[in-house]
From Swiss-Prot:
This is Phospholipase A2 MALT0035C. GO terms for cellular component: extracellular region. Expressed by the venom gland. It comes from the Eukaryota. Its cofactor is Ca(2+). Keywords: Calcium, Disulfide bond, Hydrolase, Lipid degradation, Lipid metabolism, Metal-binding, Secreted, Signal, Toxin. PA2 catalyzes the calcium-dependent hydrolysis of the 2-acyl groups in 3-sn-phosphoglycerides. Residues 22-27 form a propeptide. GO terms for biological process: arachidonate secretion; lipid catabolic process; phospholipid metabolic process. It catalyses: a 1,2-diacyl-sn-glycero-3-phosphocholine + H2O = a 1-acyl-sn-glycero-3-phosphocholine + a fatty acid + H(+). It comes from Micrurus altirostris. Disulfide bonds join C38-C99, C54-C141, C56-C72, C71-C127, C78-C120, C88-C113, C106-C118.
Amino acid sequence: MNPAHLLVLAAVCISLSGASSIAPQPLNLIQFGNMIQCTIPGSSPLLDYADYGCYCGRGGSGTPVDKLDRCCQAHDKCYTDAYRFYRCWPFLTLYSHTCSNRKVICRGNTTKCKAFVCNCDRVAANCFAKAPYNKRNYNNCK
């Protein structure tokens, strides 16, 4: 093998070894965002809920700051249960749902994991729609 081929092979191996340490990105957040937009038309889920209170967004700890934050806490627990009961990865689980008249319907999900995760997101989206949004709680875990 000539030196140029070895150099390319080494670069590919180094790139792949670095890529293996990158955490997978949540694939179903787009679906969850679509559900929120179904129940709260005109909302911007990624902007509005990515860092709200103590539980909306990545991680979660402490005491929820309000009803909306409790929705996120319950959603986090639901995702934990999805893994515990079905050994599925909620952030990577893609499912089927429809939206009609601000109502989300989970349907056509062929595995218990997909059905469970879809229901986690559906319940959370409905909870968000019933909870007041307090701008003071964005980026604020008391």
